[in-house]
Regions:
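Non-catalytic cap/lid and distal C-terminal segments of serine-dependent acyl enzymes
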Residues: 1-166
Length: 166
């Protein structure tokens, strides 16, 4: 796990921080959003310019959960780890809000696929979901029942020539 704390992080601040859980894509690791994506620099600049408030980013290594004999991630294990261990750990060790409305999950490529599965399994675990250049999650039979997907706060994005979205 790699964690971004705002420049002026205050463990005793009265108002707890919001949290963005951010998943890398296939072949990546927890540091990709910071080392390749410059997430910390981007957020620092947005905060400095008054375009967003300070928040915490938590990046996990989802590539550790690969189904044996397959190239795909074990999305059930990632979901359980996030829900049962990662969120409670962050909430116990950092000054963060425990309100669902103050928690978001987003991911790139295979991370977007992860985001889709987490949303499907427990749409109320996070207040917001972001899927960036995600692959064909609709190919999963379990996603044919959309009844759990009510009033979503979802942001979808893909590049103009992103073949995964065509």
């Amino acid at each position: 796990v790699e964690i971004y704390l705002p420049a002026h992080y205050d463990a005793e601040r009265e108002e707890p921080y919001k949290v963005l859980y951010l998943s890398h894509g296939g072949g990546g690791e927890e540091g990709d959003w910071f080392h390749q994506g410059n997430a910390a620099n981007i957020v620092d600049r947005l905060v400095t310019e008054g375009k967003c408030e300070e928040f915490i980013i938590v990046c996990m290594n989802n590539a550790e959960y690969i189904i044996e004999g397959m190239r795909d991630w074990d999305f059930d294990a990632i979901f359980e780890n996030t829900k049962d261990y990662l969120i409670p750990y962050i909430e116990q060790n950092y000054n963060v809000s425990t309100e669902v409305a103050d928690r978001a999950y987003a991911g790139l490529s295979n991370g977007a696929k992860t985001t889709t599965m987490i949303y499907y399994k427990d749409p109320e675990l996070f207040g917001y979901y972001g899927m960036f250049s995600g692959s064909a999650a609709w190919a999963w039979p379990e996603l044919e029942d959309y009844s759990a997907m009510k009033e979503p706060n979802i942001y979808l994005a893909a590049g103009f020539a992103d073949h995964l979205m065509m």
